[in-house]
């Protein structure tokens, strides 16, 4: 005899431990919030037991990654074992050439993993275009979530040890903890070993009132950005425009591009906010990953504000390794272009990502040339007159949006069609009708940009207000935010955009 209630519980438990590619465990899901509450309760019992805490967090982190990528969580374990051993070999090696070969081995293993899973079919497609369809057969290769992030994070560890900037860990579990720590595992920020590792064995774990309040604030703002702004405008406006641009006027196509600029910012910075906030609740500090990038008055400033952990990684481990700005002006421009081309390729195996990287690389090189030949040219808006800064923000934002058009479009034909509609079929007379027809989406787009462009002191004031509020009030605010999310969310899970990278 079976009991329906028992069957229901069994089904839910099976779903809890089964991998489902269509239902990854993401920060904005009710399941994650429920699991994290339970995790946090047990975690607090280990605040004075470093080893038990490390094992407990690793177990939850691997479970978290398993729910996103299935059996490929073993790839993460392999990467941790490989670079842990290689790093110790680098540190112990007596000869410079031995150290060099070992760091090359680390880079080869990491890029080999990344290349196989991410770029095999891209290279097969290029080969078929060059030598005829059917020259090579496409492979059914699964792309593990966030592989680009943990590969870069692991490479930075071995490179820092090779450069003599870091000593290797003696305990493999500490390194596995660093590489698999679930808040930043699948979409960053890319955390440097020298910043994070000293925090692992803190005893006891200290979560101050300021850390707890700031963590709550960041989780709530991240949830708002992702589930209310990004997901809503994506499903109800942006996706429709990019799917069938010829069905829409040039104004709608332009607003679709602007909407995507806000969508990807709210999606990615929302994840980063939640990751940083969750880490704070666990007693860890992550670096800031976004700093109001659409306030940038130059493309150089944009890359100091957008995905800061990636841009600094590319600067420290690629641009400087290529020679940086130490080899003359022409070499500097070439290094910038190559760095951003590879940065574009890091985002995905498609021509559109390479073109996106090329656009940004060329823009950075031209801006550096501009500063070299024009007296008084500035690198950031803070150094400009207000009118020059306003013009710079307008120009930089639209240049970045041109890049987002390439980044989002499924093909270059979509790029051409949307630009054609904007320049030849703008149809300004339809603007009032379009705005009223998409009132909800346009209201959220306007609100999102207004909040983004507010002075930094307003954001800091709101953060202090929430972080210093009584615990009961913080709980009420969290419950209210979750209720709002439930009212506007789609029935389908909307993964974070950067999960695919």
Regions found by a protein language model. Give the residues of each.
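Membrane-embedded transmembrane alpha-helical bundles that form the catalytic cores
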Residues: 2-451, 455-500
